[in-house]
Amino acid sequence: MGKQEDAELVIIPFPFSGHILATIELAKRLISQDNPRIHTITILYWGLPFIPQADTIAFLRSLVKNEPRIRLVTLPEVQDPPPMELFVEFAESYILEYVKKMVPIIREALSTLLSSRDESGSVRVAGLVLDFFCVPMIDVGNEFNLPSYIFLTCSAGFLGMMKYLPERHREIKSEFNRSFNEELNLIPGYVNSVPTKVLPSGLFMKETYEPWVELAERFPEAKGILVNSYTALEPNGFKYFDRCPDNYPTIYPIGPILCSNDRPNLDSSERDRIITWLDDQPESSVVFLCFGSLKNLSATQINEIAQALEIVDCKFIWSFRTNPKEYASPYEALPHGFMDRVMDQGIVCGWAPQVEILAHKAVGGFVSHCGWNSILESLGFGVPIATWPMYAEQQLNAFTMVKELGLALEMRLDYVSEDGDIVKADEIAGTVRSLMDGVDVPKSKVKEIAEAGKEAVDGGSSFLAVKRFIGDLIDGVSISK
């Protein structure tokens, strides 16, 4: 290869908001850090039928409009998507089937891109970076003799689980059993044995367990795995993979990658209302409650949270989703007279500018669903967390934060709303009090890990991991030429 700056990287994200926003930030990080070694990053964006595409694409384009070296290419939709009923019943099965249907579209897009690069002769595609849900697309990389790297928008602990699943499956060829909830699993990278009850709910049903295993079995085929975490946060997990005896890909701890922009469908007037209210509150006086973008709270659970907030009597911002078929707005789901009683105490909203809220000096605690992006954002701003996981790998994240790292306060570790599980008002109120008191999880400890994250990115371990990844990528292009 004649010039170092002639390398192009192709990134293929998964279109859930947390995944695609982290991907955009990853691309910016690679461009800002590598100087001229990467000429261009091309993001091949594809959508899902139930995600409004026009608004999403416009928002994503706005995020990269000042980044001339980042190109966003939108791909056509799958013509015969899996039935929506499959997503409702077995989300992981739907996701894997949809990704497989995207493979021919990705192949055509990549073929077109490679042909244009061959004609110009000035830029060479160095490799692919795939969201971990997109690992079936490793086959496309192999067809074009391109190395595939995985971008894991989760923790090193989650990576340990993905290594563990195929190993367990070779011995026990069936899904996990909820009746063995207290069974302990020796997951790589964990100091503590991990109880079955905190594993992703999809591992307990055959229809969704098999896609998890199929994805995990493809991980060793990658050239390397970029993990959105850092060594100071998960030292044991990364130490394990550093000395991993198996033929496993190189691990690059490149986090924290923080999503600096909130989701596209936030009303700007609502954002202004929330931030203006926060500006008037004392430092560290507000608890922020937010439960993610995919789960609706039941009416019973909403009532219990409302009672708890009245009991605890501290300032709050409470963001939650409701079923639009049942309620036109979150206010309709609240107990009668609740807003009148807490008029001076807090704000209720359906959507909130999470990054801005967590960054605000008035916020002193976060009751979180424990999505990994949310955990990194909260830690990044030094805000203590109380764990209330809802779905996917969030129970495992909560276990990691509470039991493994001692960086969060336990509300619940194994909450499963589908089982009719309800957290009572007294329990919620007690946890919120403890969170805001800062005794069980001192704010100083969270601040220390926040500083460690900043240092990792600013010339420290994560900076060096990105540098090593770029070097490996460019060297691979030079060798293959």
UniProtKB/Swiss-Prot annotation:
Disulfide bonds: none annotated. Pfam families: UDPGT. It catalyses: a flavonol + UDP-alpha-D-glucose = a flavonol 3-O-beta-D-glucoside + UDP + H(+); a 7-O-hydroxy-flavonol + UDP-alpha-D-glucose = a flavonol 7-O-beta-D-glucoside + UDP + H(+). It comes from the Eukaryota. Its EC number is 2.4.1.91, 2.4.1.237. UDP-alpha-D-glucose binds at residues 153, 352, 354, 369, 372-374, 377, 393-394. GO terms for molecular function: flavonol 3-O-glucosyltransferase activity; flavonol 7-O-beta-glucosyltransferase activity; quercetin 3'-O-glucosyltransferase activity; quercetin 7-O-glucosyltransferase activity; UDP-glucosyltransferase activity. PROSITE patterns: UDPGT. The active site is at 19 (proton acceptor), 131 (charge relay). Keywords: Glycosyltransferase, Transferase. Transmembrane segments: none annotated. An anthocyanidin binds at residues 19, 392. It is an enzyme of class 2 (transferase). The keyword Glycosyltransferase applies. InterPro entries: UDP-glycosyltransf_plant (IPR050481), UDP_glucos_trans (IPR002213), UDP_glycos_trans_CS (IPR035595). Belongs to the UDP-glycosyltransferase family. Possesses quercetin 7-O-glucosyltransferase and 3'-O-glucosyltransferase activities in vitro. Also active in vitro on benzoates and benzoate derivatives. Glucosylates other secondary metabolites in vitro like trans-resveratrol, curcumin, vanillin and etoposide. This is Flavonol 3-O-glucosyltransferase UGT71C1. It comes from Arabidopsis thaliana. The gene is UGT71C1.
